[in-house]
């Protein structure tokens, strides 16, 4: 345990369980699980039932099974660790969380980490610690989930949107600098769809104008910028563990930082502003939040972390298959490839349709054929509450708006079957050509 850890765990409760297995112990994270997930076993059994379809023998699953947009990879290891937590009698703010924080910090190359209830919670606390308040302006991406703006709106700050680069889908640094005013206090950079932002340029801009830079890496665990993992570059960053993310705990997030003071304050804020040290359990030194995580979630996350390398590998393989399958379809633009400075961590697989293609018709066709899809993702500034509260409208960020009007998410998850990807490509090809 690192020097200075911690004190928000109740000193009165719970004996720490044995250390969860790590990479290199019983099973290497790059290996597939010893037992297939229960869901997979059920599908495999169903696939053995044969029916006659159009004069040929096809499985029930092949003919009718719906393909979801996402599906977490859960196997026996997650069950095993969760049961250990349940049997320990210590379910929240216990040793499993501390263990996870140590391992995730080591994984991303940051000295400190603090687990929280969601990625949004982590971003909110960093905005709170930045001292943001009414009248302050914060620059962020219009092409992201609403949490990228809600995190500072909760502190009373005003959203300012910088348009995106049409290739990376991240904020264009030139647009960020052009958006700065005397009231600008911070930048929330989003690593969209797992593709790293231009961190060096954004850090230079932030330093030149004395701004706080916060990295929303909620979609980008495992991504690398200039050869180093996101989280290791000195900027406070947040990762998230919703079920569609690279790894999941059901819910949850983690703040990673190079500042012990930031870590300590997040640990206090997440637990109603409690102080640290012996006898301090009911000693509250600041107004805080209930952004606590549970040891049950930490156990799931630890099991996921053991196989994260394999998760990232399988998702990269699936993305490469899609790129090959979709390359010959006219009117479909696949995601940007990696380059020397940017290594994506595959979160979702989102294609962009040509302007002349009717997206609604394509989506209807995919869904009719059992392929889940979604508009991914609408611009934040065009959400109803943004229009009503701030008066935003079309034309504010034309690049982001043009992209958001044409994007389409396809089924994508760690264990997606190659045959299912072929099916998605065939259905999409037919839908686009119709």
Residue ranges and their predicted role:
Residues 215-249, 278-284, 333:
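Conserved active-site segment immediately N-terminal to the catalytic lysine
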Residues 52-91, 95, 411:
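N-terminal "arm"/small-domain region of PLP-dependent enzymes with the aminotransferase-like
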Residues 128-217, 224:
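PLP-dependent aminotransferase-like
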Residues 90-137, 151-155, 161-163, 228:
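Phosphate-binding glycine-rich loop
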Residues 98-102, 110-114, 174, 178, ...:
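PLP-dependent aminotransferase class I/II
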Residues 1-59:
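Hydrophobic helical membrane-anchoring modules
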Residues 21, 28, 158, 212, ...:
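Residue-level detector of anion-binding/catalytic polar loops
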Residues 232-274, 295:
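Active-site PLP attachment segment
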